Amino acid sequence: LDDQGELFIWLLASILLVRTALTFFMVPYLALGAEITDDYHERSRLAGMRTNLGWFIGIMASAMALMFLFNEENGVDGRFVIDNYCTYGWINGFLVIIFSVICIAGTWHYIPKLASGAAHVGNNMLGELMSTFRNKNFRYLVILDMALGGIGGITATLLMVTYTYFWKLNATETSVLFAGPVVAAVIIVAVCSGYLNRVFEKQQLLRLTCLLTIINLLWLTPLKLLGLLPDNSTLVFILIYANWAIQVMMSILRMIATQSLLADIVDEHELATGKRQEGVMFAAAFFSAKFISGFGYLVAGPFLDLIGLEAGVQPGDVSRTVLWGLGLIMGPGLALIMLVPMWMSFKVNMSHAGQLAVRQALTERAIRSDSS
């Protein structure tokens, strides 16, 4: 499409359709985690397996595309060839269908095994949604997820741009950074998550990951902006690799803690109201995060215009304004936004002992209900 207006309409419609389809799939997918098991640690292990696989497969797809589809041919950088993105879209669409069918077939037998409270069906969707926000812990986690969604939207939009123009990496180096740190992070989390779950409670792990993420965002890009790093050296590449590996590791651990805490909040809400609303709760949390992540994408585009990054410009030809803009938003800027999740993580008031007490009370209620 040559017309900017038509291109905007097409992109907007495509994003809305993709997000809608993703929501219809992800809400029951996430909510089912609260029904498969009611064990405190088992929920963390389940969320860990799901999150690790999601990160690993998602990033490997991008890395493989950079290596084999967007690689340099005849002196032309494949990232700047429009036709490559069409092929990339078709391949991803085919893979989404395959893995969705596998997921649906693998979890189908859990549908009849819902908790007894799940049988409640409300006739006022808005009322059901608002009732979930009476739970303070749920409100805090939703706000936390919304802030993280904004950070995710900005990062997803500007990460490739930052690698290309701020760090001046080629396609091969970028593909290594897309895959390598994620693989390292997934392996470390898979090996250490059991130990971390025994040492830390979920809310403690949530606070720790928020704090370490802020620290990790504040050291690398400022060093580059202040001229304290050599240009295009092996050392710089290793530092970028380590920085992104830490970032991904903290993100995975935080997602595991958040999803597992949401499953516990479903129990807490059921005890308080007599209604089991895991679908509504996970839908509200997921929609809020994705809604704000959309604003992250909206912010990133005008931001690139603001700092003066022109379409098609080569990495070595950008101005210092572009470099400073990218460095500030992808480092201190994101750290500033991370203060919101950090604040919310300290307001969450949950514990292992509290969850055991909730499960015990629910069991006793179910026994009394069956006996009557």
Where do the PLM segments sit?
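Membrane-embedded alpha-helical bundles of multi-pass transporters/translocases
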Residues: 1-372
